[in-house]
Regions:
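Long, well-structured alpha-helical subdomains associated
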Residues: 114-189
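Active-site recognition of the HExxH zinc-binding catalytic motif
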Residues: 72-85
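Short pre-active-site segment immediately N-terminal to the catalytic Zn-binding motif
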Residues: 58-74, 94-98
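Post-HExxH zinc-binding segment in Zn-dependent metallohydrolases
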Residues: 94-128
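Auxiliary, metal-adjacent structural segments of Zn-dependent hydrolase domains
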Residues: 1-67
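Substrate-binding clefts and substrate-entry loops adjacent to catalytic sites
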Residues: 84-95
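Non-catalytic architectural context of zinc metalloproteases
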Residues: 3-5, 71, 137
Length: 189
């Protein structure tokens, strides 16, 4: 793993965030021999940039907001770098990650349960699910894996995934409405 920190990031990077970045990078074997510049951003949770020079990759940069950084954000930005690789030497690879924010969220969640610590930003889901993300995280991850498999034969796999997520939210709501909210005790006079 080759990481270069920008001067701004050197000033702000906490040990926790540095360990999170290294742990996340270990789950991206495609980036193992690549120098990745890690910078700081104030405006967004994160961003990723792949710079090309004369048709080949010159630099790969991710920028993160250190305060409150999550594995999901780090994984999402690293997945963007892999999407950028698709335009270079990997362009003939059949299993490349398609470009786009929703696709990036789907492939990030499917990669490893580590990246399920926070709800994805771009995949549509009910607010209730986002608020109670830990209850749904692993099930949504399984749906993301299924959507990637479905992609080979079904072009609207993202629409399918978002519909399944919506159904999942409704199912859990119905299950909770059937069960009593509080136990009742018999009233004896």
């Amino acid at each position: 793993m080759l990481i270069r920190l920008t001067p701004q990031m050197k000033q702000r990077l906490t040990r926790r965030a540095h360990e999170m970045i290294e742990h996340s990078l270990a789950l991206f074997p495609e980036l193992q021999d690549t120098l990745i510049t890690v910078g700081y951003t104030r405006k967004h949770l994160g961003s990723a940039t792949v710079i090309y020079r004369k048709g080949s990759i010159d630099r790969m940069i991710i920028r993160l907001k250190v305060r409150g950084v999550t594995y999901q954000t780090i994984g999402h930005e690293l997945t963007h770098l892999i999407q950028g690789l698709a335009h270079g030497a990997r362009s003939a690879a059949p299993d490349k990650i398609p470009s786009g924010e929703k696709q990036c969220d789907i492939w990030t969640l499917a990669r490893d349960p580590l990246f399920c610590d926070d709800a994805p930003t771009y995949v549509k889901m009910p607010r209730r699910m986002r608020e109670r993300w830990p209850d749904y995280a692993l099930t949504v991850r399984e749906l993301c894996i299924a959507a990637i498999q479905k992609r080979h034969t079904y072009r609207q796999y993202i629409r399918w995934l978002e519909e399944e997520i919506r159904k999942l939210s409704k199912q859990s709501r119905q299950a909770k409405s059937i069960a009593p909210a509080q136990l009742t005790l018999p009233f004896i006079i």
